[in-house]
Amino acid sequence: MSRLRVLAANMAAVITGKAATAVVGLATVVALTRHLGPTEYGYYRTVLTYSAFAAVLADSGLYMVTLREMSQGGVDAGRVLGNALPLRLISTASVLLAAAGFAWLTPYDPPVKWGTLIGAAIYTCLQASDFIIAAFQSVLKQARNALAEVTGAVVTLAGVSALIFTHAGALPMLGAALLGAVVALVISLRLARRLVPFRMSCDLSLWRRYLIAGLPLAGSQILGMAMLRGDSLLLSLFQPAAAVGLYGVPSKLFEVTTSVPYQLAGLMMPALTMSAASDRAEFSRQLGRTLDATAVYGVAVVIAFAPFADRLLTLISGERFAAGAPALIVISFAIALAGLTHVLRFTLVACGKPRLVLFADAIACACAFAAYFGLIPRFSLLGAAAGTVVAEASALIAMTVALRRAGHSIPSLINPAKAVVAGAVAASVMKYLADFGTPWLLALAVGGALYLALVVLTRAIPRELLHVISGTVRKSGVRHG
């Protein structure tokens, strides 16, 4: 099987797994929002946002360093993973427990303060599971990770559904999320060991090397998480819990949808690492294909969320959450920008330029927080969404400049431009159909089908890649894992 086919098969596994996880996650959000309401769901989202923000402080750039180390020829991948994983667990748990203690010094309500203890356990498991993805990506076996992720999401949904009958509040629901995170971690560990046999070990010299190599990436991760979570965190400080709850659904959709291009970028990193030093033409082709696919995906998200945002939120969470529609419309554009930024960030790391990533993220973070502080106090959740667009646009521009400083340029933008035009046509058709009384779900389906047809006919995405992905999903599901 050619490398393109292997990558496409793995991307099909990623898309299938993420789609399944998204469906289950959406069902969980539906259950949570309809049961808890804006205020209690606001507590739930604030805990997860606070814990996620704290978790990244302990990241140390270990994920990208480990993936890069495991992608190099002649390296004992099991030794790399066996030493890096306990370092990740210890650093994450320590920082999260400290953050949970610090939460008691903040003006948060008691449910949030107690919830941060559960959040610390949740994100210790989630960070470990995300770290283990490096093992699956290094050998291009993504379907196994998808299995762990989907199973964890199903367990969380089952726990939430059971707790609804007891009229539980936000804290027990966080317990259900913890149960799902533990199950996903256990499955990931078992499956990863079958692909890359490893034993937990503590080689202090390796720990020191990984930490030093990861410092620029750690700074970049901290800045990136500050941009990603800063909107919700500042919203929780400047606005009541109900506003956080209303913003929580668009924010959750942002998290779910941006995970797909993040996974694609991670899949491409081994190939980009090898070609960056030896074959500039192949490097440019691989980067171009990845950006094309990411642009097509990003435009698809915009036309899926923006035209019928109020009805989509009503369908997901009920009429009480429809007030978050303007924020969802704005944030859909941030999703498209974030996907492209993920690709460029991984590309710079593959080129051995983590300091440029840190520099770019520092500039973007400064722009983001200027927007957050300027917009959130005045415009609430709409200001948070607009600030996110500023953050992602700044990051994309900064990463593009950094790539040029690394000696590479962005490949042709013809295919992304085709995707934008196709999306505009599809969105116009949706609006036309809706204006004439067509049910919005039918109009959305017609517009989506038209968009897919246009990007295929205009070759905005390579046909071979499309054929392989569709064939893999149709014929073999997760068999390639």
Regions found by a protein language model. Give the residues of each.
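Membrane-interface junctions at transmembrane-helix termini in multi-pass inner-membrane proteins
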Residues: 69-72, 125-148, 332-363
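Alpha-helical transmembrane segments of multi-pass membrane transport and lipid-handling proteins
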Residues: 82-110, 114, 158, 162-165, ...
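Membrane-proximal transmembrane or re-entrant/amphipathic helices at the cytosolic face
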Residues: 428-481
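Helix-loop junctions and terminal segments of transmembrane helices
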Residues: 25, 58-75, 138, 254-292, ...
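Signature of the first transmembrane helix
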Residues: 3-63, 96, 100, 152-157, ...
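N-terminal membrane topogenesis motif
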Residues: 1-24, 75-78, 82, 204-220, ...
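Interhelical loop/hinge segments that connect adjacent transmembrane helices in multipass membrane
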Residues: 1-3, 7, 143, 170-171, ...
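Hydrophobic transmembrane helix module of multi-pass membrane transport proteins
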Residues: 51, 86-223, 229, 431
